Amino acid sequence: MPAVLLVLYVNPPPSVCILTQKLSLGLYNQWWRVCRSVPPPWYVFFNKRSMSTFKLMMDGRLVFAMAIAILSVVLSCGTCEKAKRAVRGRQDRPKEFPPPRYNYTILTRYNATALASPFINDQVKNVDLRIVTATRPCEMIALIAKTNIDSILKELAAAQKTYSARLTWFKIMPTCATPIHDVSYMKCNPKLSFAMCDERSDILWQASLITMAAETDDELGLVLAAPAHSASGLYRRVIEIDGRRIYTDFSVTIPSERCPIAFELNFGNPDRCKTPEQYSRGEVFTRRFLGEFNFPQGEHMTWVKFWFVYDGGNLPVQFYEAQAFARPVPPDNHPGFDSVESEITQNKTDPKPGQADPKPNQPFKWPSIKHLVPRLDEVDEVIEPVTKPPKTSKSNSTFVGISVGLGIAGLVLVGVILYVCLRRKKELKVCTERLDSPTLDL
């Protein structure tokens, strides 16, 4: 609302100009009709030149501007951070950007391919799971895990074949999965590092993540700048190289304390969170609900770090690989997995006659993610857990105090002016009745 009022005042369209002129003229006529017959109380303190200046100020423009300013300050308490983020890129820019990692051509037709299901079937016996935990609010974290991509590329290089690849990040919810980042690569040279390809699709991101997420230098990891608690949960990275898929899961935990520079994220929106059935039917096309952001990796990362520091964040010295979660047997009963019989159960021997059946070995259970996934209500909005109210920062307290002070000062000023004018008019009316004269020259 404040931003709209500011735009209308700085660069108003013709219709708004006409309406403003009529409103200002009407206010001026009503004001001057009340006060024109009475010398204002400040007349003794100003000369005629000052009064001429005051009349220009009272033609409605200054009043309208003051009204906009006061209203904007009062209504900006909850929207100042979002407005600042919306226009910060136009005000400041990083001093320099790193050179591109490689040159490539973007072809839109590669976005027309349906997205394969991120839900893993019983053919996958081993999935790497990493643990990422933020130690404090407003922290920049990284989802990094090494893979066996190099061995696949060496195999392709020995066969002297180019390859195509696709990298997709998902946010796994209890009943669906939301793609948050997707890019396809074509005509790739296996002798070079992964993703150094001649052609690629549009770089697609979930819109709410563009200013707070970017790929790492090798384009395999994901960096999140000041994620909110609603970003906690399970993330899945799917790398597909010539039909072969590599899955990596990241269990992310963000503190519940409020971060003033974080955006709340809703990953459970049914328009983006797709069920296993939708993936299996080939109905998921990321082009329909993800936004384009075709910036090179280095430039995008520079922007994210710049905005993070601009908002008051502290950059980490270095990003480290996420800690691996060790497990002894294949996963079972995990979101995104079909029921898989435990290897231990399969190799179990029958008990000897006369002996009691020993207690069967329990299959390995993945760690529950219920405490990591925010609940969704009927309108699909994130419900934050009940926590102690955060301490109000000094900057917010000062801002609210100034806002209230300006609002009270404006109301008092308007009230005093109206009171003086009405009182002068009343005195003039009494004098007129006493003199029993139709007019009174002043």
Curated annotation (Swiss-Prot):
Compartment annotation: Virion membrane
Function: Envelope glycoprotein that binds to host cell entry receptors, promoting the virus entry into host cells. May trigger fusion with host membrane, by recruiting the fusion machinery composed of gB and gH/gL.
Secretion signal span: 1-19
Family as reported in the entry's similarity comment: Belongs to the herpesviridae glycoprotein D family.
Record membrane topology: Single-pass type I membrane protein
GO annotation, cellular component aspect: membrane; viral envelope; virion membrane
Pfam families documented for this protein: Herpes_glycop_D
Disordered: annotated span: 331-364
Keyword Cell cycle on entry: no
Protein name in the entry: Envelope glycoprotein D
Membrane-crossing residue ranges in chain numbering: 406-422
Coiled-coil stretches noted in the UniProt entry, renumbered to this chain: none
Side Intravirion, residues: 423-442
Family annotation (InterPro entries): Herpes_glycop_dom, Ig-like_dom_sf
Virion surface side: 20-405
Any GO BP: symbiont entry into host cell
Claim: Transferase is one of the keywords in the record: no
Disulfide bridge map: C138-C259, C176-C273, C188-C197
Glycosylation sites: N103, N111, N347, N396
Top-level lineage group: Viruses
Record keywords, A-Z: Disulfide bond, Glycoprotein, Host-virus interaction, Membrane, Signal, Transmembrane, Transmembrane helix, Viral attachment to host cell, Viral attachment to host entry receptor, Viral envelope protein, Virion, Virus entry into host cell
